[in-house]
Amino acid sequence: MFKLKQDIILFLLFLCLLSCSTNPKSPIDPKKNIFITKPEITFNIKNLPKQINVFYLNSVIDPDSTSSLIQGITENYYYYKEEIGYAPELNFIDFSDNVYCMENMTQLKESFSIGLLFNEDYSLLDNNCYQRLLKLKGLLVTKNKITGTKDKKLREFHISREVDITNLLDIAKKNGSIRAIIIDDSTTRDKALIEKIWNNMDGEVVSSVSSERKISSQKLLAEILLLEQSKVRSRKLSRIIGVQIKNEPRKREDIDSIFLSTSLPNARSLKPALEYNLADNISVYLIPSWGEEGNLTDNELDLEKVVISEMPFLLNTNTSFQEINSRNNSRNFAIGYDAYELVLLLNTSSRRNFNYFGLTGLITNKYTSIQKKSLHAKVINGKLEYQDYGD
């Protein structure tokens, strides 16, 4: 009996050691600022699609967005063509014409498709075309969640700024933030959304304002920090007692954090004004605008101590596989690049569940959904110090 128990214990120890030895090591290397890597998997070309159809709604308002998405796809296409010889037939189809959409559905049904519905409302599609679209095999890249995608053959890569906001506010909450001021601008206009998310986390919004171009940053912050009220009270008291009172404003003690949802230029203007108005000890969190492209530099002194949530590709991180031309440094390029990567991963039977450290962030594939988390960084002495992906 003792021998049997001993054998069982040894067997369990063996299984434990085996599981530890096969536990994959994270491919990212924070010491080298490497947060973007290729999946650690050997692709079997025979299992990958021989034809990939990329359909999109060509935006008249912002054609550059569609162009950047397609550039990202083709960049990754040529990477795998050169590295492993995988070069499927790549077709690009504009579905702006609903008649053309219906005519091509039969062809699309027989192959793998990438649907770029990121910059246009999918409701622009004819209902018949839309319903057939939901029966395709492939990947939909969307800005707004698609309803009716229950077919396991059609997966959705949902790119949502709201997720970035939620993750960053979660970090603020863990850092002890409770009472906050929210500032958005004309490129975001989402202070109401941020307030709703923060309230759901049991946080309190003391004030929420929009930074408009006609109002200077110093005047805006002086108002929300109640510095003008302090001056008015001092003048009134001086008149009552007949003695000149020196006004020494103190920072508001009823707030502990400020959430900026603005363009990068606006954030660079607001943060120094914040310090000038005696609120330098308040924690500042930034979710950069998606409506206005801008690049972080290697010397962001105006954003000192600000915590930023962003795609790693736009946080000046390094990649472990290739240097990507800086002229392609855009959000939509990163989305297109990762979409093509997902095509390969979703068609590899041995890797149903995976973690991919992509250009847009940490992408996790689970049975029910594909999820993405952005990277977080804090500006220290003008340099970005990378923290981690949101929990």
Regions found by a protein language model. Name each.
Residues 43-44, 70-91:
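Signal peptide-proximal N-terminal region
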Residues 110-121, 139-142, 179-185, 231-241, ...:
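Periplasmic-binding protein-like
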Residues 202, 221-235, 253-257, 271-338, ...:
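Extracellular/periplasmic periplasmic-binding protein-like sensory domains
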Residues 88-108, 164-167, 215-225, 240-244:
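Structural motif
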Residues 21-24:
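Bacterial signal peptide processing site
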Residues 323-388:
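Segments of small-molecule ligand-sensing domains
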Residues 114-208:
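Extracytoplasmic ligand/sensor domains, especially the bilobed periplasmic-binding protein
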Residues 35-71:
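Extracytoplasmic "Venus flytrap"
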